[in-house]
């Protein structure tokens, strides 16, 4: 269920390419194969010294979306592959070679890699699934930041955003004397990240919602 929202990225007549490197994330690969299901896909190994032509040859022309699933398991591999995709895209544009829309499916831990060129996230339309995301360009987040800085004199942390969400969802019920508020299973979006609380077989209630983060080449970030 974690990667359920990625399903539509692979639907229809898409050119799907799995890219591996020297170090790969086997667990992520299994999850992506499950999401892709019976849709056909290509596979390529890209490492330092690999001719970029190998990627160029796998790109579909105008009218077909290209979805690259990057399975590299470390920062070096991810950086190498994203740079190669960007280079191939630039080369094809320079040669006026028609290319379908390019999307990259990656991992949420990429945001913790300090040396990645974040502009490539936008250029290559990177998507990943995460348990929490707060984009400071979002209007709601910007408003929260402004009020938080006025009150505390510093920029809020990720824990500040999560704390705000918790108060918005549970504060009213707790103030009314209810230890646990009624949770209907509906999706709640206190700030930007969605939540869906459901009760499992053991009677425990927890958040089952995962957010799909998508960077757009128009320099926007959507979270759903």
What kind of feature is each model-predicted range?
Residues 1-224:
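Extracytosolic ligand-binding ectodomains
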